[in-house]
Amino acid sequence: MDMAGHEVNSSSSSSGAESSSSSSGRQQYKKRPAGRTKFRETRHPVYRGVRRRGGAGRWVCEVRVPGKRGARLWLGTYVTAEAAARAHDAAMIALRGGAGGGGAACLNFQDSAWLLAVPPAAPSDLAGVRRAATEAVAGFLQRNKTTNGASVAEAMDEATSGVSAPPPLANNAGSSETPGPSSIDGTADTAAGAALDMFELDFFGEMDYDTYYASLAEGLLMEPPPAATALWDNGDEGADIALWSY
């Protein structure tokens, strides 16, 4: 009886160990979910058929070909999203048979119907559609660049023509004109001449230089006059001498 109970307990414990090991194995090797784990949105939020390409900030254009399931038409890479959107409009106009063929509803810009010169092309000739779209976009960008350059040049001409010379400043005497460089130089020359005239004084009166130097020579040859008698020779030493006598 005891042996039978012991066998039952051992079998139940072994089955419990096997079930726990199998459950731990299932938890360890859990199956990964299928599908993409990371999705990066590159489509432009506004323009149709435009998406970003790479980290350089360039934009590509790709449109669906109407009437062909899964067919797409590659239109190239552009610097700006607006240019890629214009390429999309040009391709849709060409594929729809012109601006009045129902392609105006799929345009990114409504003015592309008359700004883009796109000839109608057959949807089967995708190479011709691509060529017509790229030529139309290139012509539009060239015209837009020329127009913007001309407007900028006109604005620059107007700005420069409106600039005039500043009015002359009034001097302290109330005159409306300031003396020019020539008048300033003339005033300086006049002042310098007056200063020189101040030093050219007539020290000798009617006497010329020859007579003046001759008189100096005669003065050197003459004997000097006798010296005046000193006061202490009069014998009045120690006496008070009045400076003034009335």
UniProtKB/Swiss-Prot annotation:
Residues 172-181 have a biased composition (Polar residues). Pfam families: AP2 (PF00847). Residues 1-43, 155-187 are annotated as: Disordered. One of its GO terms (cellular component) is nucleus. It comes from the Eukaryota. PROSITE patterns: AP2_ERF. Belongs to the AP2/ERF transcription factor family. ERF subfamily. Transcriptional activator that binds specifically to the DNA sequence 5'-[AG]CCGAC-3'. Binding to the C-repeat/DRE element mediates high salinity- and dehydration-inducible transcription. This is Dehydration-responsive element-binding protein 1H. The lineage of its organism: Eukaryota, Viridiplantae, Streptophyta, Embryophyta, Tracheophyta. The gene is DREB1H.
